[in-house]
UniProtKB/Swiss-Prot annotation:
Mg(2+) binds at D109. K(+) binds at L176, A177, I187, V190. One of its GO terms (molecular function) is 5'-flap endonuclease activity. SMART domains: 53EXOc, HhH2. Belongs to the Xni family. This is Flap endonuclease Xni. One of its GO terms (biological process) is DNA replication, Okazaki fragment processing. Its EC number is 3.1.-.-. Has flap endonuclease activity. During DNA replication, flap endonucleases cleave the 5'-overhanging flap structure that is generated by displacement synthesis when DNA polymerase encounters the 5'-end of a downstream Okazaki fragment. Keywords: DNA-binding, Endonuclease, Hydrolase, Magnesium, Metal-binding, Nuclease, Potassium.
Length: 262
């Protein structure tokens, strides 16, 4: 039987639902809304396997902050009411047949990337449910990303329209242009348009740096900030080598075994 693994970026979904609630202390409303959302996702995707990946709730910013100390340094903590309600949310999702993968220091995106890659490389179908465009660097013929809230696929045509690049160039793009929301600086003075110009001419940061054809207007910037660009690319990239501690059989979706109705 063909495999279709659905991976839910849990906090990406939960935080958006929570922020839309009139009373953000009402965790039951979050549970009700997210379970309805999950039921719709199950109906639309028809997974054979499914898991929800949760980020750790601590302020530890992980290995990325060791490389770039300013990485997400102003990240707001999870609202207290939501943090206290996480166990209840996970329990409600469990009753729908969805197990949770809880990170222990690793960022959820690396756990998602590792699991998605492990399955996709065997030519099995993987769908990531998230609005996070960072996952687009993982795109492959059998790996896709669904933005549930905008009802769109974050696929190769989306990447071409949004960035003008191939998915495999996105980490280099962010290494050059940076990601302001995460305090990934990139090369000062190289914004999205310049990064696109460079990566249209050269496939990678290294290729651009090593070429005598790099436009003069960028040469000084590269000479002064090349190492920063490499570090920023590393931080913007996704790890796919995290030890997960379970196998695919453990997250097989069995419809109705833990039925939870709303």
């Amino acid at each position: 039987m063909a495999i279709h693994l659905v991976i839910i970026d849990a906090l990406n979904l939960i935080r958006r639902v929570h922020s839309a609630q009139p009373n953000q202390d009402d965790i039951q409303a979050v549970i009700t809304t997210t379970t309805r959302t999950i039921n719709k996702i199950l109906k639309e995707t028809e997974p054979t396997h499914i898991i929800a990946v949760f980020d750790h709730h601590l302020q530890d910013r992980g290995w990325r902050a060791e490389i770039l100390p300013q990485y997400k340094e102003d990240r707001k903590p999870m609202p207290e009411a939501l943090q206290k309600g996480m166990d209840d949310i996970q329990e409600a999702w469990w009753k729908l047949g969805i197990d949770s993968l809880l990170s222990d220091g690793d960022e959820a995106d690396d756990l998602v990337a590792t699991l998605a890659n492990k399955v996709a490389v065997h030519n099995e179908q993987v769908t990531i449910i998230s609005t996070d465009k960072g996952y687009c660097q993982l795109l492959s013929p059998t790996l896709r990303i669904r933005d549930y809230f905008q009802h769109r696929w974050l696929d190769a045509p989306f990447v071409e329209k949004e960035f003008g690049l191939k998915p495999e160039q996105l980490a280099d793009y962010w290494g050059l242009a940076g990601i302001s929301s995460s305090k990934i600086t990139g090369i000062p003075g190289v914004g999205p348009k310049a990064a696109l110009e460079i990566l249209t001419q050269f496939p990678t940061i290294e290729a651009a740096n090593e070429s005598e054809d790099l436009p003069k207007k960028y040469r000084k910037k590269f000479d002064e900030h090349y190492e920063t660009a490499i570090l920023c690319r590393q931080v913007a990239g996704l790890r796919t080598d995290i030890e997960l501690g379970f196998n695919l059989q453990d997250i097989r979706y069995e419809k109705g075994t833990r039925d939870y109705q709303v």
